[in-house]
Design a protein with these regions (language model features):
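Conserved nucleotide-sensing/catalytic segment adjacent to the nucleotide-binding pocket
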Residues: 1-51
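ATP-dependent NMP and nucleoside kinases share a basic, alpha-helical "lid"
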Residues: 51-90
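Conserved protein kinase catalytic core
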Residues: 2-6, 58-59, 79, 133
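Short gly/ser/thr-rich secondary-structure transition/capping motifs
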Residues: 49-54, 103-107
């Protein structure tokens, strides 16, 4: 991620309130990620490299560098619970998290995350993982090694 002061600020579409937009691709230092990924691949030090994040499939250059693209689908209510637990652990209040989630996150999710999930090779159920689906993913990864 970029430093907090370098991240974009967005206005909520309905209320016009300004929020630091951590759900926008410009939040991520994509050039650094691309360089780090290339360096890790070229080093030969790693058999498997996992790139995780809600914007991973959005950038075409990053997608093209991945051998396997997975998207983990979660219901909106599960996403907010996970976000609340994580962000409250970072010291944010319930109201701070709930406000940005209600006012900005759904729009960014539709714009960048939902629209890019179709770039995945597999879409997995994040609410109820399937042992068969996980076995298929593991089998594919092992076939590349």
């Amino acid at each position: 991620f970029r430093a907090p002061g370098e991240r974009p600020v967005a206005e909520a579409p309905v209320t016009g309130r300004s929020y630091r937009d951590d759900n926008h691709p410009d939040t991520v230092d994509l050039e650094k990620l691309k360089g780090d990924l290339q360096q890790a691949r070229q080093s030969g030090e790693y058999e498997v490299i996992i790139v995780e994040g809600l914007l991973t499939l959005w950038d075409k250059e990053i997608r093209d560098r991945l051998n396997l693209r997975l998207y983990v689908e979660c219901r909106p209510d599960e996403r907010i619970v996970r976000r609340l637990r994580r962000n409250m652990g970072w010291g944010l209040s319930f109201d701070e998290i709930a406000d940005v989630y209600r006012e900005l996150v759904p729009y960014r999710h539709d714009e960048y995350v939902e629209s890019s999930k179709w770039q995945a090779d597999f879409i997995l159920n994040g609410s109820k993982p399937s042992p068969r689906a996980l076995d298929a993913v593991v089998l594919y990864i092992r076939s590349l090694l």
